[in-house]
């Protein structure tokens, strides 16, 4: 069943030469927890780019159906579509990813007034998208490339790193690492796809159009500058050409109202190919080091970038990623902690029979919670959020240990009260000759029955020990009043009682020692498992970083080779230097990666190893036990 359309919502608008983010759009993005594929469509006014947006949004109409600048303030518009349908809808929770469409108001619109508006909207589209679609008319020629002068200003509008390059060099590798794929769509294409009399594909047409043209003419230099920037910043390129939607002049005048079957079949075929490519190959928005952006993460990015622009700064990827990491890692801590609490509550039946039973469940739930955090966190500098999680899990584990003790204490006390009720109700009947033996028989039966009660928990011995201590004065009174016993027999009985009490106290202390040993062994095992989880994550991040750098190296090497073959030695040499530096960085990552990981792991182990206050308290119990053993 087709879901109802969701109207486009303005994401970024320009009021009085000041960009602002629409909070309604941010609230919608915040609800999208899946990774997002972000497609931005940019082009000059009245070039038909809205039709492309409609193709992706599932509207079978031609340009004009999306709001124009007369109806919406200038800026980006967003719509969300799931990957399974072309209807513009909220992304369902079960979808693995969501599609976010960013439609810009037309570039060069004189009604917008602010000349910088186009520059910033162009830059934001590049920063936010994973696929950047540039739409133009007729052909890719000098004029079309001159109109794309915005791409030559990206290095002035965007920074990759918080600290500038120490040599002041604008390194294209910094941008290649996070720039989107580039798709050029040409509407009302007027040429045949031929080169030197041979048929060529639209992609080959684009690559030929991006070849540098010899000459010092200012127009040639301007178009060459755009060509070079596209080739260096956007190594993944694709092109689609669209012939006229219809050759009927009267129908062209009514493009907004004609039906789909009145469109030229070749035009419809191109539109379907474009939409199919986007839905099949458009990638999830990914930042450096393989960080996948979710809907709520996209909202954080756009807010951070717009805040930077409004403050007079240049949007910086590193700063945005840091802001995003702070938010996402904080959420990851809460997700992991909630998972731990939910799973502990589901799997535990308090009181547990032994402390080991609780520790086993805790270990399993903690391991899962750590995995949840590792999955949803990134760039956790100095493991500050992981430390918060560990402290939170320790606190929660302590609460479960306390609840377990309280449940055991309550249950044991209730059972002991039930079993000893007859004894306590008839205590006066033992003040007779031979009463001490009768009292001891009944108490021994209580003890026997008590230890037959299942799942008393960790407080079973302590509760019974307290019961015996509460009976000590009563037993002594009954013993002294028993005229059937001689003074010597009473002394022997009293000595036996004290010895038995001392032995039970020793048993209780040994039990606490055993529980402490189990706790410490379980903690050590968990620490090793947590350390291994952290090691895997650090190594995966390093491998991803090396993989990303190798991909950049491959793309830049290919582009450098092309420049060299075309005879452009200056551009080839610039890329050679960048390739050399990138190769050096990869070599350093491989050589120093292990030592860096080990350094982080050592620091982490020193954090998780120190004994807690509760462990110190247990140590004092051990000290007391050793003293008693020496007596």
Curated annotation (Swiss-Prot):
UniProt keyword annotation of GTP-binding present: yes
A molecular-function term among this protein's GO annotations: GTPase activity
Pfam families cross-referenced by the UniProt entry: GBP, GBP_C
The GB1/RHD3-type G domain, residue ranges: 33-283
InterPro entries for the chain: G_GB1_RHD3_dom (IPR030386), GBP_C (IPR037684), Guanylate-bd/ATL_C (IPR003191), Guanylate-bd_C_sf (IPR036543), Guanylate-bd_N (IPR015894), P-loop_NTPase (IPR027417)
Family that this chain belongs to: Belongs to the TRAFAC class dynamin-like GTPase superfamily. GB1/RHD3 GTPase family. GB1 subfamily.
Protein name: Guanylate-binding protein 4
Species lineage: Eukaryota, Metazoa, Chordata, Craniata, Vertebrata
């Amino acid at each position: 069943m087709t879901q109802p359309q969701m109207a486009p919502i303005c994401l970024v608008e320009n009021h009085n030469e000041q960009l602002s983010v629409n909070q309604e759009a941010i609230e919608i993005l915040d609800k999208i927890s899946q990774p997002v594929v972000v497609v931005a469509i940019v082009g000059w006014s009245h070039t038909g780019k809205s039709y492309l947006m409609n193709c992706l949004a599932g509207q079978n109409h031609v340009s004009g159906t999306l709001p124009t600048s007369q109806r919406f303030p200038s800026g980006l518009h967003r719509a969300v579509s799931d990957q399974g349908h072309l209807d513009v809808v909220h992304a369902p929770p079960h979808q693995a990813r969501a599609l976010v469409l960013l439609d810009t108001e037309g570039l060069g619109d004189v009604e917008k007034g602010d000349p910088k508006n186009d520059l910033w909207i162009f830059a934001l589209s590049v920063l936010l998208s994973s696929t950047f679609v540039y739409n133009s008319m007729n052909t890719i020629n000098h004029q079309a490339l001159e109109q794309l002068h915005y791409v030559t200003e990206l290095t002035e509008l965007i920074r990759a790193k918080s600290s500038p390059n120490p040599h002041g060099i604008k390194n294209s590798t910094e941008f290649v690492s996070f720039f989107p794929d580039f798709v050029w769509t040409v509407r009302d294409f007027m040429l045949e796809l031929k080169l030197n009399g041979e048929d060529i594909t639209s992609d080959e047409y684009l690559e030929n159009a991006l070849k540098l043209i010899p000459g010092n003419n200012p127009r040639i230099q301007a178009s060459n500058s755009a060509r070079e920037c596209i080739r260096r910043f956007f190594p993944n390129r694709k092109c689609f050409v669209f012939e006229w939607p219809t050759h009927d002049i009267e129908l062209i005048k009514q493009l907004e109202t004609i039906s789909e079957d009145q469109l030229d079949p070749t035009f419809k075929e191109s539109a379907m190919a474009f939409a199919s490519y986007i839905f099949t190959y458009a990638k999830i928005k990914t930042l450096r080091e393989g960080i996948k952006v979710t809907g709520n993460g996209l909202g954080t990015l756009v807010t951070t970038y717009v805040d930077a622009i409004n403050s007079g700064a240049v949007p910086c990827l590193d700063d945005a990623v840091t802001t995003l990491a702070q938010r996402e890692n904080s959420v990851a801590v809460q997700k992991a902690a909630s998972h731990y609490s939910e799973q502990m509550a589901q799997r535990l039946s308090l009181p547990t029979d032994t402390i080991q039973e609780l520790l086993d469940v805790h270990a399993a739930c903690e391991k899962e919670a750590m995995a949840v955090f590792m999955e949803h966190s990134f760039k956790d500098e100095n493991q500050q959020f992981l430390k918060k999680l560990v402290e939170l899990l320790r606190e929660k584990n302590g609460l479960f240990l306390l609840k377990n003790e309280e449940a055991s204490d309550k249950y044991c006390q209730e059972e002991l009260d039930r079993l000893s009720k007859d004894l306590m109700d008839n205590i006066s009947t033992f003040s007779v000759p031979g009463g001490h033996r009768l009292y001891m028989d009944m108490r021994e039966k209580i003890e026997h029955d008590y230890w037959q009660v299942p799942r008393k928990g960790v407080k079973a011995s302590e509760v019974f020990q307290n019961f015996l201590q509460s009976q000590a004065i009563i037993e002594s009174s009954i013993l002294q009043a028993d005229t059937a016993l001689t003074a010597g027999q009473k002394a022997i009985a009293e000595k036996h009682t004290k010895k038995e009490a001392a032995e039970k106290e020793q048993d209780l202390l040994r039990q606490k020692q055993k529980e402490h040993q189990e706790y410490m062994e379980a903690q050590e095992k968990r620490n090793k498992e947590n350390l291994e989880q952290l090691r895997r994550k650090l190594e995966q991040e390093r491998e991803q970083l090396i993989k990303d750098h190798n991909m950049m190296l491959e793309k830049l090497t290919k582009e450098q080779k092309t420049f060299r073959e075309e005879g452009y030695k200056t551009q080839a040499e610039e890329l050679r230097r960048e390739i050399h530096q990138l190769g050096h960085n990869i070599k350093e990552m491989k050589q120093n990666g292990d030592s860096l990981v080990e350094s982080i792991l050592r620091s982490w182990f020193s954090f998780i190893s120190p004994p807690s206050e509760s462990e110190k308290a247990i140590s004092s119990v051990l000290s007391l036990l050793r003293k008693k053993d020496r007596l």
